[in-house]
Amino acid sequence: MKEGADVKHKDTKKECEELWAKNKYYVLSKSHKVYLDIREYLKEKEVDILSLHEKIQKVRDIKESKKDFSNAILHVWGYFKKEASEIEKQGLFNILEEYMEGKNNQESVIKYINTLLKKYPNKYLQESTLLTGEQNETMA
């Protein structure tokens, strides 16, 4: 009986890790604090997919934070920085600065990142709900 429970636990843990992988940059873009809270939750011995789903869903109601969004974009940029040209880098930093100054919106920044993603494919980022805009589809 215990062995079956261990397998189920591993499956649940794996499901949670997959769900988190898809949503972590979205969560980070909304709240660094919630991002850290969820990371701590996932270190627990027992995790629950529905509980994780709820935690992720709750960030949808959090008011936009330019600082947290910018932080998430800089994390995502880390996947491109070795391949992208200086012009592409400057393009991102310019559009991000304009966003911080209120001259454009998150969609503009995400659109630019998605342009880089087409040029420099990355399966992990291609499944990120921050970049796909599929925040309603947070189940793994």
Give the residues covered by each predicted segment.
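Acidic, Ser/Pro/Thr-rich low-complexity regulatory regions
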Residues: 1-140
